[in-house]
């Protein structure tokens, strides 16, 4: 059945369950192909049990359709988790879209469209080369941001990106090497998980300022939130061409 564009529940790495109501991730039946297949079966008098023709596929038919390999992005905490086959592979602070300029990264359930090494992200007034490019919502994607000294905290409010999720280079590399086109990206907001860090986290994992916070490695959960008790996923029911002009850096 169709699950694309339908609400999805996620037991987050913070122990709370959220409902993600937007985004195109999920199964989607190809109406034209399915109709043609059914007509053919009827004409031939055949009776069979078969899977529908899909124009878009998801990870699972049981429980939540996104399975146990996905990127979990908490836009409130500015922190993400990448689970591969149910195990936490990497987590990190990030910087999302600039809220003050109206470029906030949208919440929703999406999928990695493709991945590309050494892309150039282009938009009005900028052309930014990145080493690891993983778009998931049009021109919005995950990528390294080696021009940033810090990540996380409240940077995104006034110093955020054009909409993309900016990552420390080492984190972007790890995700890139272990993610595939079609893998889910689940973005959400969660009240109560706002980071207390005002300066963000440096590339090496130390705090940028002497604000009231301890230095937290980029592989640790935000201070105001509880990290997962284990590394298991939460229970859930060649250089290429430049990226098109609409890409957000």
Model-derived regions: residue spans:
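Surface-exposed, secretory/extracytoplasmic low-complexity segments enriched in Ser/Thr/Asn/Gly/Pro
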Residues: 1-127, 132, 179-181, 186-192, ...
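Exported/periplasmic cell-wall-interacting domains
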Residues: 104-105, 119-219, 224-225, 231, ...
